Amino acid sequence: SRSVAERLLSPSQVADVAAAMPARYRVLVLTAAWSGLRQGELLALTRADMDLDAFPARVMVRKAVRRTDAGEVRMDVPKTASSVRVVTLPEPLTDALRAHLEEFVAAELGALVFATSTGTTPARSNLGATWRRACAAAGVPHVRLHDLRHVAQVFAAEAGATLPELMARLGHATPAAALIYLHARTDRDAELTAALGAAMSRGSDGSTVTP
């Protein structure tokens, strides 16, 4: 399987791919990358699941889209009990969601947040093809749409999220998956090491360090 590093995008790359998506799906990309919701959770969101007037704004994850063996779309409970959660949103994403709701989402509380022009759940195959075209147009190395969940976990870890916070935010049932992302970026580790070195240098200025 691919390493975590092979599944990552930078914040600017996420913005570039989002800009290359059809307008209706741009904010879906941003929400995936900055909230960490699974694709099925994103596609199940309705107006009733969002509280953009709270501070910070938040979404309630309480259902997920599943596709049956017959190809039918069904709303189901999330993957695990820990997947039922409240996820807070950064302010720029909140602003983008407000604009998205106004332009693309029907007024009813049950209206899907990310839907086709007819208000139905987009087919994952179509969404995946659209995503691949956007990656190519943006000149971004191809990662899967699902990989935005991994991207979100690294963004949160780099922002200082602790292990319990990552588990709660991403809906992990065990620490194992979340731990991966606390160590995912070698460049971040290099930054940390450099900062430690600078602190050590400051501490030893004017003094002799003895073993």
Where are these regions (language model features)?
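Basic, Lys/Arg- and aromatic-enriched nucleic-acid-binding interface segment
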Residues: 1-45, 53-55, 66, 82-84, ...
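C-terminal secondary-structure termini that scaffold catalytic or DNA-interacting sites
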Residues: 19, 65-93, 106-107, 116-119, ...
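The DNA-recognition helices of helix-turn-helix-type DNA-binding domains
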Residues: 35, 49-50, 173, 184-188, ...
